[in-house]
Amino acid sequence: SLHDALPILYQDCLVLYPESVWFATQNQLRCRLNKWNAKQQMIFRQFVSDAEVMTPDGNGRILLPKRYLQMAGIQSDVRFIGVDNTIEIWAKERADQPFMNPDEFSEALEELLGDENICCDENKL
């Protein structure tokens, strides 16, 4: 359930983080960055400054501020895409376009997983 959500803009979409995931992600990023490196501190500052706690109303809805919609180029219809433990909110016209063409996708999969021996545990199916 989405008790509190923290949206940030990332790659032309809004990403909603459940509060517990947000704090874990923020901590993970903080641990990877050098606080004495000005550029890395600016990255962290930008990441956390875009977040805002949003609590659903009695019907489970959240109202996204206009500035978030404008930042993501959302004018009317949206598409929700569940990615791991976050929810991405895209302008429908952007999300209806392929994120990668089939050749790029195939090449990326081969690059990432081509040397892996991926199999599944039949007992878990």
Outline where the language-model segments fall.
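Short, small-residue-biased leader/transition segments that mark boundaries at the very start
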Residues: 2-6
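DNA replication sliding-clamp ring fold and its partner-interaction surfaces
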Residues: 1, 61-64, 68
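Flexible "stalk/tail and boundary" regions
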Residues: 7-53, 58, 67-125
